[in-house]
């Protein structure tokens, strides 16, 4: 039982990064972005490609982050420039990225057990601690960003686009920023998941949006009276609780 809980916490920490990204689109921007189901495996495949080319795993994760952000921007282009509904724009991006992911490595799955991942790079540290540090850094950076002018305008865009326009700002810019950040985090989570598993698989993004939304709901439900916890903290705790419940149920 202890091993199940420990492994569930590890998975929860990985999924918490994805969940934080989903909070930005679904809760802050009220944008039903489905493209994370494409950018999650995109991050894994981009990482796998860079790693097998001999790139340092940390730099490979940065590439994954950038690839995911680009995927999010594609969704924005489809939504705003081509006037496609939000949910359909995300589905189109997800479908497009399925083909992209296959082309990156030329195979639906790729293993890299013979390559050094971030967990081998810092092998003196437990996997859980490495993931906890990464998650904490992301949380702190995002919390800081949301307190900046751009962060406040991102929050305002989700609440009232008219208000943002009255301030002389373009809400489209902040929708784009939100989608880029959200999908970049999804891709980073995918890269970490691939490293944890030792392989990337084309199906690893299927239904992850359901898991992420369930994590958000659980975090809000369990901690609805904990006003001292902000949205990113609740997302992290919700993801961990969800994975523990999921692990025990299996």
How would you describe each model-predicted region?
Residues 126-209, 214:
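Helix-loop-helix "hairpin" substructures at the membrane interface of multi-pass membrane proteins
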Residues 24, 49, 73, 77-82, ...:
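Membrane-interface helix caps of multi-pass small-molecule transporters
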Residues 3-54, 61, 78-81, 217-224:
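Single transmembrane alpha-helix segments in multi-pass membrane proteins
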Residues 86, 90-147, 176-177:
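Transmembrane helix-bundle core of multi-pass membrane transporters
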Residues 8-9, 13, 38, 58-66, ...:
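Hydrophobic alpha-helical transmembrane segments
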Residues 186, 190, 196-250:
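Transmembrane alpha-helical segments in multi-pass inner-membrane proteins
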Residues 22, 55-95, 100, 136, ...:
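Alpha-helical transmembrane segments within multi-pass membrane transporters and channels
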Residues 25-43, 82-92, 153, 177, ...:
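Short, non-helical or kinked segments that cap or interrupt transmembrane helices
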């Amino acid at each position: 039982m202890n091993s199940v809980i420990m492994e569930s916490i590890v998975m929860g920490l990985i999924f918490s990064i994805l969940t934080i990204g989903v909070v930005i689109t679904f809760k802050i921007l009220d944008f039903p972005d489905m493209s994370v189901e494409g950018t999650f495996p995109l991050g894994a495949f981009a990482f796998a490609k860079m790693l097998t080319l001999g790139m340092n795993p940390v730099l490979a994760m940065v590439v994954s982050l950038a690839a995911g952000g680009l995927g999010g921007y594609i969704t924005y282009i489809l939504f705003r420039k081509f006037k496609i509904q939000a949910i359909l724009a995300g589905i189109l991006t997800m479908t497009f990225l399925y083909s992209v992911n296959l082309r990156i490595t030329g195979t639906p799955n790729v293993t890299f057990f013979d390559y050094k991942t971030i967990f081998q790079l810092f092998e003196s540290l437990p996997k859980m601690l490495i993931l906890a540090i990464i998650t904490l850094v992301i949380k702190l950076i995002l919390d800081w960003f949301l307190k900046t002018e751009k962060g406040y305008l991102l929050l305002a865009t989700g609440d009232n686009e008219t208000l943002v326009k009255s301030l002389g700002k373009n809400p489209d810019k902040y929708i784009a920023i939100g989608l880029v950040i959200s999908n970049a985090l999804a891709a980073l989570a995918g890269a970490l998941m691939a490293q944890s598993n030792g392989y990337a698989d084309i199906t690893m993004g299927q239904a992850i949006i359901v898991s992420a939304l369930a994590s958000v709901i659980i975090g809000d439900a369990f901690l609805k009276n904990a006003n001292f916890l902000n949205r990113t903290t609740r997302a992290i705790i919700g993801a961990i609780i969800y994975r523990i419940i999921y692990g025990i149920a299996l």
